[in-house]
Amino acid sequence: MLEKILNSRSFIIFSLPFFLGLISVFSFQPFNFTFINFIIIPALFLVITYVQKRSKNIYRKKPYLRNLFFIGYFFGIGFFLSGTYWISYSLTFDENLKLLIPFSIILIPLFLGLFFGFASLFLGPFMRNNYSSFFLFCLIFSLTDYLRGNILSGFP
């Protein structure tokens, strides 16, 4: 059963954005490997266009939007799971707050990943495999990142 899941195409398509999100944190300090973004962002774009094109051909209805949402959501979970670990460090200074550490590690990335999920959901119907779609992809993801920072009063 597990072998069938691991060999399926959907497992690869949905786990790839998660690992891309995990790896993208290496472009920030203290690692500062900024060239990783030049690999990760086009790879995420290609995954979204592949799923959008493939799902439209298979379903011919609207369930492909759900797939696009989960691709962005899993990318966001991976990105914030590896990028917000520092919040748990601030909860270790008080004995009463140590109970919140598992919630801070799990629930914050699950919530913040929704922003990337809604970005890819909104982007889905407009996606083609060309330069203008890539520009729109970067614009929508930048806009949702800006909104995330302003909605949550400057949370990085």
Model-inferred region functions:
Residues 2-156:
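Membrane-embedded alpha-helical bundles of multi-pass enzymes
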